[in-house]
Structure formats: structure tokens, C-alpha cells
Amino acid sequence: MASVFMCGVEDLLFSGSRFVWNLTVSTLRRWYTERLRACHQVLRTWCGLRDVYQMTEGRHCQVHLLDDRRLELLVQPKLLSRELLDLVASHFNLKEKEYFGITFIDDTGQENWLQLDHRVLEHDLPKKPGPTLLHFAVRFYIESISFLKDKNTVELFFLNAKACVHKGQIEVDSETIFKLAALVLQESKGDYTSDENARKDLKTLPVFPTKTLQEHPSLAYCEDRVIEHYLKIKGLTRGQAVVQYMKIVEALPTYGVHYYAVKDKQGLPWWLGISYKGIGQYDLQDKVKPRKLFQWKQLENLYFREKKFAVEVHDPRRISVSRRTFGQSGLFVQTWYANSSLIKSIWVMAISQHQFYLDRKQSKAKIPSARSLDDIAMDLTETGTQRGSKLVTLEAKSQFIMASNGSLISSGSQDSEGMEEQKREKILELKKKEKLLQEKLLQKVEELKKICLREAELTGRMPKEYPLNIGEKPPQVRRRVGTTFKLDDNLLPTEEDPALQELESNFLIQQKLVEAAKKLASEPDLCKTVKKKRKQDYTDAVKRLQEIENSINEYRIRCGKKPSQKAAVVPPEDIIPSESSSLSDTTTYDDPNDSFTLAGQRPSSVPHSPRILPPKSLGIERIHFRKSSINEQFMDTRHSREMLSTHSSPYKTLERRPQGGRSMPTTPVLTRNAYSSSHLEPDSSSQHCRQRSGSLESQSHLLSEMDSDKPFFTLSKSQRSSSTEILDDGSSYTSQSSSEYYCVTPAASPYYTTQTLDTRARGRRRSKKHSVSTSNSGSMPNLAQKDPLRNGVYSKGQDPPPSGYYIAGYPPYAECDLYYSGGYVYENDTEGQYSVNPSYRSSAHYGYDRQRDYSRSFHEDEVDRVPHNPYATLRLPRKAAVKSEHITKNIHKALVAEHLRGWYQRASGQKDQGHSPQTSFDSDRGSQRCLGFAGLQVPCSPSSRASSYSSVSSTNASGNWRTQLTIGLSEYENPVHSPYTSYYGSIYNPLSSPSRQYAETTPLDGTDGSQLEDNLEGSEQRLFWHEDSKPGTLV
């Protein structure tokens, strides 16, 4: 029993194990078969694609041409889009390739254009199996085909317009569609023959867009309307039909516009149209009439970042009256949204269209005139081949155009007949050119022979340049003397009276010498020494002429003849002025635009620096001499000759226009040695450059540190502002210290006078000032000044030098260009910026991180505010900014108090200050308590920016021009290093304001700075800059 049981168990185990084994084997076989089949499919697919991927790299592409031909080629990784365009253009013998481009449809269904400076395979080509489809089309449109030079270009424009109308890219009404279809029939098939043939041709030609067929479901109706127009244009040549077709299409509003589907901030869909005219925003159902149109001249910057495309629009109507004077504030940002790839495509298209717009503006001046449409029609009619009616398809797919290293070879895509005809045409053109060149050459050879013969007659030798044919001998020429010259009859000796004749000839010769000397003496732009010498030569020549005339008269009297009336030249007073006069080289100009630079003035060390005049707002209309008081005039009348030196002054001081109704004291006269901008001539252009002579210290100004509470000014003896001392224009200050050149300016009073530093006084002050300011001595430009706020530690090397190094009206740095040099700034694939019109000066986009802290927007609206980021993508803060109303109010109180204090000091006598030699200020800067300087040190928010401007009158400085307005941060570029201590952080703005070019900064003395601090400390309003704070944030 037990054995039987064990045998059954063994049989069961054996059968079970066998079953499991068979199941495993069958499963493995099934799995192996399936996997083997999959491997076979993979191998079969790989072997099937080996024809396409013959090389390990490359992509099979198919270019659809405008004449319905297809060009197949293998694009290598190194092939540029420009080379591919050249290859395609060679199949049309196209010369004007700048209007065309190659486009493709990406995976999202959006049309993209190949960028010519990129490689073809670097673009986001569709990843679908099979060859990549590319389309050759017109990318840049023009106003009329009359501006096209080549007939092949005109024909391609016609084919492109016909394709765009058929695809619906150009919206056309039904009646216009029927007219265009009739013109296409006339162009391709010729004159009307029968309705049956016309209907048959209309079914094969692409003339009806889908929209027209939807409006008119009856195809017979459309064909009948086309036939009606077809009968009217019977007899029209092919060229005339093409020209009429293009005239109709060019008049359509949607012609030449590239449309993109975008959304605004509210999520509403729009069409964004970009063309050579600008950027337009269209309704989704209406592509004809734009809701908004921004021309290129209105735009300033184009930005894109990820899914946002933004443009900065310059709208003068948005500039308020109060802001028109102070800066560029008529900017608002228009933004649209779409997917990232589409946004980048829009940005690239906008850049290319703007570049084409600029190129068109420049090329219009070069093109003499547009071609006549009749001539274009004749050229198109004479063309034997009708490429629009030919459909050529390459069936042999094994033939490719290999273009990897720039070698572009085409095969099998050009008609032999067309090539032969083009060759014949080119040969004829070359023969015509050869004939014209030969005719011109013969004409020039004859002219050269004549010139050589005339030279041989004068010199007696035949020149080597005389053209000779092979075997030809040069002609024999005799030298002819006197044949081309005519002597004066008076110079020829006569037998009547040789002595008198000699005197007469000497008189004529001397008269010619006098005329020559007069011309030399009256030449402009001469230095004083040369001019004086020439004047003396002219005077001597005139005296010699007068002596000869007297000798002639005496001799005639002795001979019993009447004295002759010779026209002796008398030196006029304008050419030979009195050298003893102190005003010999001065000139009075009635027109403020006249030149301020005279002959005796030394040129500036900067050869290309523009010269500037004082602005018109100053009221300077006449340049003449002015005395500060009646006593000074009286003293000048009595003792002018004792006080004046032998030199004459080439400069004059400027007169300020009197402002009626003011109780302010008279503005002092600008001294001649103040090297201010009044000696310069204005330049209407917007070019700015650094105006300095020698080193950076050559025109700096001395700031004295005083411990007293009141400022003191040194008074000098009375002296005329038109004295005859040699003036220093700053052109030779290259090795002396900056403290050697200054002018003492007393406070304004009835006894106010000015002093000009002469050579002797300059030598005395040079020894005195070495002990006062040692950091400025020498001519090294990199000497740093110590900042009292940093306990004697030198400031950063990047800090700009004081404003004394520059002439007013020029930016502190030449490299701080206010706008880009054209082109676009492209960062990466997700963001970019392009400057459209660099002429607009916006304070927000002059640079990147370097300039971002100094940019502030004047606008309060979120749409109008220009963001600080150069890509215009920073979100505006939703929370309200820190209020600075109380701060601004306290600052204004301090400024008004300072203004009143300065007025009182000018109006009152300066007896206490007049005798104190402790402090002296530069007359160019003066003691102007500049209200704008205080505003310069205060960080202004956008809300308080406009209120920081303060209207003041002229100050007591003789070198100060401003009489109307002093402005804060936007007007004063760079504060002078002042010795006072303040709670304001030092802010430096390297960008000059575009609206005011003649503003200057003025240092505050220690007293004024401390008083301003006290006023602010009383209200417990202190502003500090946090190191980690963002621009425009008050901490």
C-alpha cells in the first residue's frame, strides 16, 4: 500500500515537472519569436533609411519653390541658412536676394523663418519622419515693383503674391478676386478663346481662395464672373497682366504684413501684424484696419522674455507740460503674450523688418529713380519662358545637392533652354559694355594726346606719357615762347622816356605786391604774431607804393608834365588797427549765434570738442563791455592806460538780459579767466565729448575747508573786465596743479568788482596753495581725494572725478553712451532686447546693471512706467512705495531757507567778508548754493521726482549763467567732492540730462551743509542706503 502510494506521488511529480518544463520552453520560444520579429523590424527600418542617411550626419530637406518646383537636398550640419538661400536663388538666376527668405512650419503649426546667420539644423525644425519641408518665399516687401531692378525679381514677387492670395494670407474681397483671376488667365494662357477652355484652365490654376468659395458656393458663378473680366482685358500682353496684377495687390492693406496670433494682458486674442511700416494690432475678425499702429519712428526698444513680447512706444501726446522740459517721459510699454517659440519668432521678425526699413531709407537716396512700369512690362513680355506654368518634379530621389562646406552644386533642376537663352543675353550685354568701353578709351587717348602736345610746346620735350601705336614715331614739336602769355603794354620799354617807364613798371609791380599782402593780412584763423607781422608787411608795401607814386609825380613835374592820378591803396582801419588799443582784437557780435572764437584765441587741446554758446534762455543777445559800478567806470576812464598792459584781450564778457520786476541785486559780470562756456560756440548737434585739457586736474577747482561759521571772500582791487592781460583758455594747463588756476569772486554789492588772475599773481598763489591742497598737485589723473565720511580712506577707484574737470554741457564720460549703436542685444533663448531708435534718450535703458540704479521713471501709471530691467520684464510692486512726502517737504524748507539766506547776503553789504582772506572760491562755480545739489543727494522716488525741482534766480557768482531754473538729479551729473559731512549717501549719476545741456554742479561749503543737516535732523528725517537694497528702495 505504501509502495503504491509512493509510486503515484513519483508519477505526479514527474508529470508536473514535465508540464512546467514544456510551459517554460513554449513561453521562451514565443518571447524569442516576438523579440526577433521586433528586431527584424528595427533592422529593416534602419536599412530602409540608409538611402536617406548616407552620411552619419545630415538631414533630408525638400524646398518648395515659387514656381511649384521642388528642390531636394541633403543639408549638412555646417550649412548656413545664407548658403542655402544662395543655392535656391541660383535656380532662378536671382540677383536681388535680400527680399527673400526660407520658411518652415514647426511642430506647433507656426511659420518660422530661417535666420541667415544661423545654421539650418540649429533651428527648431519639425521632428516628423520624412524629409523636412522648406518654402522659398518673399520675406521683405516694398511699396512697388518699380523699385526692383531685375525682371526675375519682379516675376518672383508676382508668383509669391499669387500664392498668398490663393492661401488666404492676403485678404481680398470677392470682386477683386475675380479680377485677379482674369489677369492670371491672361498671363498664363494668353487671350480669351472660348468659355470651355477658360473654365478648364480655371480648374487647374490656383486662383480661388477658400474664403471666396465659402461665400459663393456655386463654382459656375465664380467662373462666369472671371470670364466677364477675362473678356475685358483681351489683348493685354503677359508683362502688362503681371504689372496690373501687382498694382492691385500692392494697394491692398494686408499686403506685406506678417500676422501672428497673440493675447493681451486681459487674455483677449489679437492679431499682431509686422511689416516694413511698423507693428500693428488687429482684431481677430478684421486684419484690414488696425486698432493700433506703431510706426518704427515711434518705437524705441523691443523686448521679449519667455512668453511676453513688449515694445516701448514714444508718444509725445503723453508728455505733460511740466515734464516737457526736464526729460524723456512720453514712453509707454505695450505688451503681448503667446508661447515662447512664437514670441521669439515675433521678436526676430520685428528686428529683421526694422533693419530692412533702415536699409530702404538709405538705399532710396542712392537709387536715382524708379523704373517705369511700362519698361517692366516689356521686359516680362520678352521673356520666352513662362516659369509660372511649368511644374517640374524631381523623380530621382537618389540625386541630391550636397552642400556641406560652402560648395553648392545644383543638378537636374534648371531648364536647358532657359540657360541657353540667359547665356545669349549675357553675351550680348557684355558685348555692348565692351563697345562702350572701347569708345571711352579712344576718347580719353585723344584727350591725352592733346595734353601731351601742349606740354611739349611749352617745354620743348615730348612727355613719355604720349600714347603711341606699334611702330609709330613721336611727332616733332617746336617750343613756342610767348605765344600763351600776354605782357602788359606798360611793362614794355619805349623810346620816349626810359626813366619814367621804369617808374611806371615799378609802380605796377608794387601794386600787385600790395594786393597780395592785403590778401595775406585778411586771412582768418591766424595767430596773433603772424597776423601782426602780415599787417606790418602790408603797411610797408603800401608805404613803398606811395613812395613810388610820389617819385613818379615829382619826375613828371620836373619834365613839365601833369602829375598822374594813381590809385594808391590806402590801408583801411579794419586791416591795420591800432596796436596800442586794448580792444584791437575784439569784435562785437549782434547775433548770439555768431562765432565766439576769434583769431587770437588759442585752440583747445581737444581737437574735436564741440563749441557751445550759452543757452537762449539766458537772454544773451549782445556781447559788449560792462562795468560793475559807476565808480569803476570813472576809475577806468582816468587810469586805463596805467592799468592796461601792452597785450590786447581777444575776449569780451557777456551781458545778462535785465529781468524786470525783481528786487534781486545785479548779477555780476562773468570774468574772462573763468574758463566758462561763454567763450565757446554752441553746437546744435547732439554729439558730446569730454572737454578737458591735459590731465584730469588741469581744470579742477579748489575747495577750502574752513572752521568758521560764515563764508569769507577775498576782494581785489578794481579792474576792468576788458583788461589787456593774457587770457588762459585752459589749453595749456597740463602740468600745473588744479589749485593754481582760479579766480576770486567777491559777493555782489554796489562796489562789486571782478579780478582776472595774471601771470605774476599766478606765480605767487602757486607757492601758497601747495600747503592747502596737496592731493591735487601734479598732473596724474588717478590721484584720489579723501572722503571725510570714510575716515581718511580713499574712495573707490570707479568714482567719477569732480565736475570741475569738465566743461558744462558735456557728459562726464565719453564711453557712457546714451544709446546703443544700433543692432540688438541678444542674451539667450528666453529673453532679448533690441534698440529701435537710439536717438530717443530714455533714462531707463542706457545699459544693464551699471546704469540701472540711476534710472527712474516719471510716470505713475503701471502701463506708462518704464521698468528698470533692460528686457522690460520686472513685475511692478503691488504694494505702495515708501512715502517720501514728509522728507520732500523738509528738504524744500531747507532749500527755501538757503535760497533766502543767499539772497540776503547778496543784497546786503559784505563788509565783514570783504576783508577776510581766509576763503576763496572759484569764480566759475562761485558760491552758488545750488538747490539742485541738495536734491542730488536725496534719493527721489517716482512720486517725489517731479517735486524736487526748485525755481531759483541767479546767484552771486560771476561765473554762473543760470537765471531761471536749477534742477535736481536729472540736471546735475556729478557733485564736486565737498568737505562737509552729511547723512545722505553719495549718489553719482554718470548720465547727463538730455533736456538741459548747460547745467553745472556747485559744491556746498561746510556751513551750508551743516545747516542743511540741522534742518533735517530737527525733523528726524534721515535717509540711509542699505547695501542689499534694490534700486529705488528707501531703507
From Swiss-Prot:
Signal peptide annotation: none
Tissue: Isoform 1 is expressed in the brain. Isoform 2 is expressed in the lung (at protein level).
PROSITE patterns: FERM_2 (PS00661), FERM_3 (PS50057)
A Pfam family that the UniProt record links to this protein: FERM_N
Biased composition (Low complexity): 571-590, 941-958
Residue runs in coiled coils: 414-451, 535-559
Spans through the membrane: none
Residues annotated with Phosphoserine modification: S372, S609, S698, S916
Comp. bias regions, Basic residues: 762-771
Cross-link (Glycyl lysine isopeptide (Lys-Gly) (interchain with G-Cter in SUMO2)): K883, K1030
Top-rank taxon, per record: Eukaryota
Bias kind Polar residues: ranges: 594-607, 664-699, 715-725, 772-782, 907-921
One BP annotation, GO: establishment of epithelial cell polarity
Region ranges (Disordered): 563-615, 631-699, 713-738, 754-798, 906-926, 939-958, 994-1035
Record's keyword terms, sorted: Cell junction, Coiled coil, Cytoplasm, Cytoskeleton, Isopeptide bond, Phosphoprotein, Tight junction, Ubl conjugation
Any one annotated GO CC term: bicellular tight junction
InterPro entries: Band_41_domain, CUPID, FERM/acyl-CoA-bd_prot_sf, FERM_2, FERM_central, FERM_CS, FERM_domain, FERM_N
SMART domains for this protein: B41, FERM_C
Subcellular location: Cytoplasm, Cytoskeleton; Cell junction, Tight junction; Cell junction, Adherens junction
Listed Basic and acidic residues bias regions: 635-644, 1019-1035
Annotated stretches, region: Necessary for adherens junction and tight junction localization: 542-972
Biological role stated in the UniProt entry: Member of GRP1 signaling complexes that are acutely recruited to plasma membrane ruffles in response to insulin receptor signaling. May function as a scaffolding protein that regulates epithelial cell polarity by connecting ARF6 activation with the PAR3 complex. Plays a redundant role with FRMD4A in epithelial polarization.
Subunit structure: Interacts with CYTH3. Interacts with PARD3. Interacts with CYTH1.
Stated name of the protein: FERM domain-containing protein 4B
Organism annotation: Mus musculus (Mouse)
